[in-house]
């Protein structure tokens, strides 16, 4: 049993709390929804509960598959116990199908099947709008090393294969998603969350969107999309 202490950090969708175990934190999932680098904001009732449950199920699955993550256990509807990592200030964006900003940037039709999975890298800095960078930028600015980045890409590729297969069984196409990583006792761990906030999930038969695009694009029924992902994951 761990006890929650002071809040260490508050982000757009989560709060991080210290605990009486030095190497553990409590991650609390909020109902806040944001898009376009915080320009669009709303409260969506139960979003935090659903994202906590979805992320917990996915991290449990990845842990069983040998992927090392920061996730320890789900504590309650909104809280997880996680290892206290030093976050690598990068996001790895995995694109299996062209959608969103990539489709717009490259003049591709949404839904275009990419000839190979594309990894993109962004520098985590809200004031800069999380700009896309390349491997040399990432190493050059001191965010990582080539050795660490190779390890991150290796884990990312494995996670993509595991998740694509798992969601395919539930008639969900994993279009794209973002991952974050942290350093913990000399190792690189998968961190943050994997949820409809961080992934694009399309129904394999209808193409219906079941993710944060419903909020970004004012499509309505945001929470129903999240709930549908959870219901299928539980099967």
Swiss-Prot record:
- The cysteines joined by S-S bonds are none
Pathway involvement?
A: Purine metabolism; IMP biosynthesis via de novo pathway; 5-amino-1-(5-phospho-D-ribosyl)imidazole-4-carboxamide from 5-amino-1-(5-phospho-D-ribosyl)imidazole-4-carboxylate: step 1/2
Q: What class of enzyme is it?
A: ligase
Single GO MF descriptor: phosphoribosylaminoimidazolesuccinocarboxamide synthase activity
Kindly list the biological process annotations in GO that this record carries.
'de novo' IMP biosynthetic process; cobalamin biosynthetic process
Keyword Signal among record annotations: no
Q: Which InterPro entries match?
A: SAICAR_synt/ADE2_N (IPR028923), SAICAR_synt_PurC (IPR033934), SAICAR_synth (IPR001636), SAICAR_synthetase (IPR050089), SAICAR_synthetase_CS (IPR018236)
Which keywords does this Swiss-Prot/TrEMBL entry list? Answer: ATP-binding, Ligase, Nucleotide-binding, Purine biosynthesis
Tell me the Pfam families matching this sequence: SAICAR_synt
List the catalysed reactions.
Answer: 5-amino-1-(5-phospho-D-ribosyl)imidazole-4-carboxylate + L-aspartate + ATP = (2S)-2-[5-amino-1-(5-phospho-beta-D-ribosyl)imidazole-4-carboxamido]succinate + ADP + phosphate + 2 H(+)
EC number, as in UniProt:
6.3.2.6
Record-linked SUPFAM superfamilies: SAICAR synthase-like
Q: Which HAMAP family match?
A: SAICAR_synth
Q: Which family does it belong to?
A: Belongs to the SAICAR synthetase family.
Q: What is this protein called?
A: Phosphoribosylaminoimidazole-succinocarboxamide synthase
Biological classification of the source: Bacteria, Bacillati, Bacillota, Clostridia, Eubacteriales
Question: What gene name does this entry carry?
Answer: purC
